[in-house]
């Protein structure tokens, strides 16, 4: 952690330096330059837990006074202890030259004691600032606007035709989420979940190379089959308007495959339709198309795939920053304008492309880019592990590793600042997912390395729900039901968990303060010991990979698995470079 002085101007403080900040628009250029990804910047609007978003009130005054105290302690730390040394020298000279040798020996000891006292005071101030922030984030929430009983009466009287739609977006239901049941059928980490359009089936993919289609209400698998992949299945999605008969899949082996399902509840075959030279983490579906979708890979390539063609895949773009390729972890199609799609990966930029206007000779084909301004020139290399569009395409949500979650207005111009920031979770160990929840994208939901699920109210950035989602320690995948107030989650555990608003009372967020503080401390410590972090990541990655190889060895024998339609016609990305094999591959490890 840097020893930069906190600034209390206008009541702003960077929490990593012991202070709070108001909004991105109010930050000066100098302050933005000082902000680092290792710290949690807290806007005053985030600290206010009222839905009005009022910056005023008594909390403001106390925050400013705390910021002043922190600044004074920060000045002591900055001196550490040049000013102290000068002070001691002046005192020594005033004593004259007649002091004893014993006094000379005691002076360094006194200096050390002063330094330790200064460091202890600074640590105490940081802890107090952290405690103040956590307390403000977890105070009582105001009364929700949507009330169940009045809404039920209106429905009975025929004046509320959209009861279910409104109920799914009501905070009171989200605060009553409780684990309903688990779906057990995998023998490895579950990396992907996807509901079909009707919401009756749920597809899951795993490190065990299997895909299972669940009747999640009856808690029974409808069918399960070998994916045909040779390594961890990262995504499996029903193609829309296909009668639930086609599943698209991608995996660590770089393959993009399609499974054809029959009405007799079996998988007829799987075939490879594209090949990345690097892991492929995500697919992007067009909302109404049963034949076309996009894939993105760590080789920086985006393929467009049309199942009606003899050669389904064609290269759409190679993502670059200047001349350097940027490996991709995530891709999403704008639901309101399917010509546009957004990608994120091994750097800090959200890139938006328009398929009709891609010219790699002009701005590398990019329509526009977004990035939190404090991360543009940050020394710590931030990666985007997941991004999603809102239901109407007006907003874009991006989750950064070892950082926070940011909301952008997708209609803003190139280089625009984020509009909201969501804090408290930890995104470090795996490629963490993020999603909107609610029919109008009213909430933001994310997993965390601490094994918990966090739900924020989108408008106020307040944590409104906090659930233990994974005993294995990491929650990666979160899939809202398309029509009901139901959430499916998965992670390092080998099961799928189904959540519904069946609790008798709203959550009390028990243990949230301790978890948030622990997450922030760990993030700060990792930022100070980046080399040790990389070593631990590499060890974790190698151990996990060796376990998976032993487990899957039997599936690698000839003749085992789905039919292999891997003809040479399936295109592969020839665009690869040594740049892609750096430590960033481990910074955003897949599960």
UniProtKB/Swiss-Prot annotation:
Gene3D superfamilies the UniProt entry points to: YVTN repeat-like/Quinoprotein amine dehydrogenase
Compartment list: Nucleus; Cytoplasm
WD repeats: 185-224, 228-269, 275-315, 323-363, 379-418, 426-466, 470-509
Polar residues bias (residue ranges): 1-25
Pathway: Protein modification; protein ubiquitination
Residue positions where Phosphoserine is found in the record: 22-23, 100, 123-124
InterPro entries, A to Z: DCAF8 (IPR045151), WD40/YVTN_repeat-like_dom_sf (IPR015943), WD40_repeat_dom_sf (IPR036322), WD40_rpt (IPR001680)
A Pfam family per the record: WD40
The entry's keywords: Cytoplasm, Methylation, Nucleus, Phosphoprotein, Repeat, Ubl conjugation pathway, WD repeat
Keyword rRNA-binding belongs to the record: no
Sequence motif: Nuclear export signal, positions: 40-51
Main subcellular location of this protein, as a coarse class: nucleus
Stretches the record annotates as Disordered: 1-140, 552-591
BP term (GO), one: protein ubiquitination
GO cellular component, one term: nucleoplasm
Tissues showing expression: Expressed in the brain.
Superkingdom of origin: Eukaryota
Positions carrying Omega-N-methylarginine: 198
UniProt biased composition (Basic and acidic residues): 66-100, 118-131
Subunit (UniProt): Interacts with DDB1, CUL4A and CUL4B. Interacts with KPNA1, KPNB1 and XPO1.
Family: Belongs to the WD repeat DCAF8 family.
Function, as annotated: May function as a substrate receptor for CUL4-DDB1 E3 ubiquitin-protein ligase complex.
Additional information: The homozygous loop-tail (Lp) mouse has a severe neural tube closure defect, analogous to the craniorachischisis phenotype seen in humans. This gene has been mapped to The Lp critical region.
Protein name, as recorded: DDB1- and CUL4-associated factor 8
Originating species: Mus musculus (Mouse)
The gene coding this protein: Dcaf8
């Amino acid at each position: 952690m840097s020893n930069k002085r906190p600034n209390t101007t206008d009541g702003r403080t960077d929490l990593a330096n012991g202070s709070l900040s108001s909004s991105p628009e109010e930050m000066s250029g100098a302050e933005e330059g000082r902000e680092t990804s290792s710290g949690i910047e807290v806007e005053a609007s985030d600290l206010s837990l009222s839905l009005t978003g009022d910056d005023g009130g008594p909390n403001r005054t106390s925050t400013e006074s705390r910021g002043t105290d922190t600044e004074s302690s920060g000045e002591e730390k900055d001196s550490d202890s040049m000013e102290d040394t000068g002070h001691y020298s002046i005192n020594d000279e005033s004593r004259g030259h007649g002091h004893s040798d014993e006094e000379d020996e005691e002076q360094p000891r006194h200096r050390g004691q002063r330094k330790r006292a200064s460091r202890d005071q600074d640590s105490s101030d940081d802890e107090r600032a952290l405690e103040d922030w956590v307390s403000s984030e977890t105070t009582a929430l105001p009364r929700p606007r949507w009330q169940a009983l009045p809404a039920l009466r209106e429905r009975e009287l025929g004046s509320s035709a959209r009861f279910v739609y409104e109920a799914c977006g009501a905070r009171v239901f989200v605060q009553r989420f409780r684990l309903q049941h688990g779906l057990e059928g995998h023998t490895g980490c579950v990396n992907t979940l996807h509901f079909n359009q009707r919401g009756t089936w749920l597809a899951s993919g795993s490190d065990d190379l299997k895909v299972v289609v669940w009747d999640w209400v009856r808690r029974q698998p409808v069918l399960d089959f070998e994916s045909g992949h040779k390594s961890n299945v990262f995504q499996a999605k029903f193609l829309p308007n296909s009668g639930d008969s086609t599943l698209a899949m991608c995996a660590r082996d770089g393959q993009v495959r399609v499974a054809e399902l029959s009405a007799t509840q079996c998988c007829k075959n799987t075939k490879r339709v594209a090949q990345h030279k690097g892991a492929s983490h995500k697919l992007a579906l067009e909302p109404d198309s049963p034949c076309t979708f996009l894939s993105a890979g760590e080789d920086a390539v985006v393929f467009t795939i049309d199942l009606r063609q003899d050669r389904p895949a064609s290269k759409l773009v190679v993502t670059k920053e200047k001349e350097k390729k940027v490996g991709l972890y995530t891709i999403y199609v704008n639901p309101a304008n399917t010509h546009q799609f957004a990608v994120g990966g091994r750097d800090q930029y959200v890139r938006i492309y328009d398929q009709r206007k891609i010219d790699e000779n002009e701005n590398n084909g990019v329509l526009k880019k977004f990035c939190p301004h404090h991360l543009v020139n940050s020394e710590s290399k931030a990666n985007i592990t997941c991004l999603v569009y809102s239901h109407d395409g007006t907003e874009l949500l991006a989750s950064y590793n070892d950082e926070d979650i940011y909301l952008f207005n997708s209609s803003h111009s190139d280089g625009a600042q984020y509009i909201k920031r969501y804090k408290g979770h930890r995104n470090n160990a795996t490629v963490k997912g993020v999603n909107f929840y609610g029919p109008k994208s009213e909430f933001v939901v994310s997993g965390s390395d601490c094994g918990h699920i966090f739900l924020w109210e989108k408008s106020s950035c307040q944590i409104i729900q906090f659930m233990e989602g994974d005993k294995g320690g990491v929650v990666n995948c979160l899939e809202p039901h398309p029509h009901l107030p139901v959430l499916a989650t998965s992670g390092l555990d080998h099961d799928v968990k189904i959540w519904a608003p069946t609790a008798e009372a709203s959550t009390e967020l028990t243990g949230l303060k301790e978890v948030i503080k622990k997450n922030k401390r760990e993030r700060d410590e990792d930022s100070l010991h980046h080399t040790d972090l990389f070593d631990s990541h590499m060890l974790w990655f190698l151990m996990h990979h060796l376990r998976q190889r032993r487990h899957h060895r039997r599936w690698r024998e000839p003749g085992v698995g789905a039919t292999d339609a891997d003809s040479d016609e399936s295109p592969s990305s020839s665009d690869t470079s040594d740049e892609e094999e750096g430590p960033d591959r481990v910074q955003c490890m897949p599960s």
